[in-house]
């Protein structure tokens, strides 16, 4: 009897160890797929979608429709991120920032990543087409196409990849708008313009910090093509200057009120000021300051709009 109990205990211990190993493997796989989905970019995409949906809504918000929109958008964006990983798997080996990603590190097979990416993109688009509307599904398809097929290869060809890549980066805000309204009007294009312009200082600051990595990988980012930084600074300030008057347009059009005008002016001005140190000293520390300001900008703008619409 004692032997049987001991034998049973040993079996239970083995099962516990096996279960623990399985859990660790599952956790590891989950973290791999999370990294393939580019959660940092996904979060910005979802913020932009919420912003567009909120502003495109007249009357009460349909929370169910918003949830479905975010689900379809998240699946499409995650799949696009995975396919970007797949296409850049060789390039990523040369950069310190990316050499430990799942594919260059050999943690997952390329075919598995490609299948995952395609499945996620198709699932996301189908959800948007069937459960939301055709226009929103088309915008998601266009976003994925431009990001995967156009922007990703252009990084090896021209420094204009940032400006072209900012188009799919700005489309999610239109997707949010069309999900709630079913159409695109002038205000939606204003939001698109804000998102398009915002991406330039955001991504140029990243490109400046990672210029050594990009040069090693032979990617045609502007700080690599023109290492003195003059062109990069001009591009940053050109787009920041354009942002200031464009952020006034929702107030001028009567879509948003005085609280928005004051708040948007303050955060856009702060965004502009955060770029001044980089213009003076061209340091990575100053570029990081601008990057942090750009990440702070979008959720701040969303909060200002929500508060403004709440008091209108």
Label every PLM stretch briefly.
Residues 14-28, 87-108, 204-232:
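Cytosolic, membrane-interface loops and tails of multi-pass inner-membrane proteins
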Residues 174-184, 243-248, 298-312:
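Hydrophobic alpha-helical transmembrane segments in multi-pass integral membrane proteins
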Residues 231, 272-300:
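Interfacial loop-to-transmembrane junctions
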Residues 38-55, 167:
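The first (N-terminal) embedded transmembrane alpha-helix
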Residues 47-89, 97, 125, 138-149, ...:
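Membrane-embedded alpha-helical segments that form the functional core of polytopic membrane enzymes
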Residues 75-83, 145-153, 194-211, 244, ...:
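Transmembrane alpha-helical segments that form the membrane-embedded catalytic/substrate-channel core
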Residues 110-179:
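Intramembrane alpha-helical segments
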Residues 97-138, 227-251:
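Multi-pass membrane catalytic core of lipid/isoprenoid biosynthesis enzymes
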């Amino acid at each position: 009897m004692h032997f049987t109990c001991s034998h049973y205990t040993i079996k239970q211990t083995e099962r516990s160890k096996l279960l623990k190993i399985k859990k660790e493997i599952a956790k590891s796989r989950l973290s791999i797929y999370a990294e393939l989905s580019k959660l940092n970019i996904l979060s910005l995409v979802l913020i932009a979608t919420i912003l567009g949906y909120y502003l495109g809504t007249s009357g009460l918000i349909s929370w169910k429709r918003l949830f479905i929109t975010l689900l379809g958008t998240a699946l499409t964006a995650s799949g696009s991120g995975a396919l970007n990983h797949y296409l850049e798997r060789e390039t990523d080996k040369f950069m310190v920032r990316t050499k430990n990603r799942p594919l260059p590190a050999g943690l997952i097979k390329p075919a598995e990543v490609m299948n995952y990416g395609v499945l996620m993109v198709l699932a996301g688009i189908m959800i948007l087409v069937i459960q939301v509307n055709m226009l929103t599904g088309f915008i998601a398809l266009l976003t994925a196409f431009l990001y995967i097929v156009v922007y990703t290869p252009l990084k090896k060809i021209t420094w204009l990849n940032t400006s072209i890549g900012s188009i799919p980066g700005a489309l999610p805000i239109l997707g949010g708008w069309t999900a709630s309204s079913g159409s695109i009007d002038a205000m939606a294009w204003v939001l698109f313009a804000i998102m398009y312009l915002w991406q330039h200082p955001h991504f140029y600051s990243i490109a400046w910090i990672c210029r050594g990595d990009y040069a090693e990988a032979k990617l045609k980012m502007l700080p690599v093509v023109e290492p003195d930084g003059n062109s990069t600074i001009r591009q940053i300030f050109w787009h920041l200057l354009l942002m200031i008057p464009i952020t006034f347009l929702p107030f001028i059009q009567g879509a948003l009120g005085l609280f928005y005008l004051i708040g948007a002016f303050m955060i856009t001005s702060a965004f502009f000021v955060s770029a001044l140190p980089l213009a003076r000293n061209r340091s990575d520390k100053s570029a990081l300051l601008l990057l942090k300001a750009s990440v702070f900008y979008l959720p701040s703008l969303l909060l200002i709009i929500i508060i403004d619409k709440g008091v209108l």
